[in-house]
A protein has these predicted regions:
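Interhelical loop/hinge segments that connect adjacent transmembrane helices in multipass membrane
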Residues: 100, 143-184
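Membrane-interface junctions at transmembrane-helix termini in multi-pass inner-membrane proteins
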Residues: 23-32, 82-105, 128, 149, ...
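Interfacial helix-capping/hinge residues at the ends of transmembrane alpha-helices
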Residues: 21-22, 57, 90-94, 117, ...
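Membrane-interface helix-loop junctions in multi-pass transport and translocation proteins
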Residues: 1-3, 58, 62, 70, ...
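Alpha-helical transmembrane segments of multi-pass membrane proteins
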Residues: 11-15, 51, 55, 66-92, ...
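Membrane-water interface segments that mark the loop-to-transmembrane alpha-helix transition
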Residues: 4-58, 71-77, 100-101, 106
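Membrane-water interface at transmembrane helix exits
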Residues: 25, 57, 61-62, 94, ...
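Primarily residues marking transmembrane-helix entry/exit sites
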Residues: 34-35, 69, 127, 161-169
């Protein structure tokens, strides 16, 4: 069930990853205000894709002929949203070469998610125990990343920084598309 939903999740994650992360790492001229605009754009994109994945869940379940896929996809839609919301702060840490901190955040998140998953599995939650913990843990991770990087949402997106990184991010996105379809 999770593997079936994972196939569609990979496609939506491909659309979510338009090369902004590597562009944030590569472009050293981006200011804090630029990062806030890029982060807000990426978050809105994640919201649109997450909602689209959520409402596509019944059709995905019908396509696979497995009604359990619906709930799994709906829970995974949170991962799409949070992946986009956390992308810029996470890549700022990569840009700053704070690998130890990235590892600590990742290990703590995975440990907590693993403990939740094991507990859910022991309580008979089935395939939900594989997907719900990562959705749950992504929310506090967002707050930790925001606190550390000081990235925040802005009401008005400045399109100039997005235009500056576009030439790099579009080729990164195209490379990801080629890689995705060569593997699938």
């Amino acid at each position: 069930v999770v593997a079936l939903a994972g196939v569609m999740l990979a496609l939506f994650n491909l659309l979510a990853d338009i090369g902004i992360g590597p562009a944030v790492i590569q472009n050293k001229t981006l200011t804090a205000e630029d990062m806030n605009s890029i982060n807000t754009f990426n978050s809105y994109q994640g919201l649109v894709l997450g909602v689209a994945f959520f409402f596509s869940a019944p059709f995905i379940a019908e396509y696979y002929g497995n009604p359990q896929v619906k709930l799994v996809c709906q829970i995974m839609s949170v991962n799409i949203l949070m992946g986009c919301v956390n992308a810029v702060p996470n890549n700022i840490l990569y840009r700053q070469q704070r690998f130890k901190l990235i590892t600590i955040i990742s290990l703590c998140s995975q440990f907590i998610a693993g403990a939740i998953a094991i507990s859910m599995a022991f309580h008979g939650c089935g395939p939900i125990s594989l997907v719900l913990p990562s959705a749950i843990i992504s929310i506090p991770t967002m707050f930790v990343l925001r606190y550390i990087t000081k990235v925040h949402f802005v009401w008005r997106i400045d399109w100039a920084p997005l235009k500056r990184i576009f030439s790099f991010s579009v080729f990164q996105f195209l490379a990801n598309v080629v890689g995705y379809f060569s593997r699938n």
